[in-house]
Regions:
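N-terminal intrinsically disordered, cationic/polar leader segments
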Residues: 4-39, 46-116
């Protein structure tokens, strides 16, 4: 990008008392390559969009989704009292994939888990 510094994407997963992921927050931009050619950013965006789409398409679980393109930030939260196992599987799948990307590119992607 020619800025002389590296930015990072931060992905924070929120875990409930049953040790299940019920929410995530993605902030920042990877800047792994020039705009329009950033495979890491595209990978994270695709994984996040796919996860949200799966919950909407394959479950009736209530959820909240906040997108702020100026920050940039995406927050997604399963909000119901009774969440389906399928939604939790989708969230775990996202976490596994993002963890893999972060292990391969630790200078560009940071993953954290918060119990709440």
């Amino acid at each position: 990008t020619g800025t002389g510094y590296k930015t990072m994407t931060n992905v924070e997963f929120f875990i409930d008392n049953d040790n299940k992921i019920y929410s995530f927050k993605v902030t920042g931009h990877v800047d792994f390559a020039l705009d329009g050619d950033d495979a890491l950013c595209a990978a994270i965006s695709t994984l996040v969009s796919h996860t949200i789409g799966q919950v909407h398409e394959f479950t009736d679980d209530p959820c909240e989704n906040i997108v702020d393109e100026d920050i940039p930030m995406v927050v997604f939260k399963l909000t119901g009292d009774e969440i389906s196992d399928l939604s939790y599987i989708f969230m775990e799948s996202l976490a596994s994939s993002v963890d893999d990307l972060a292990m391969m590119h630790p200078d560009y992607i940071k993953v954290s888990y918060t119990e709440s």
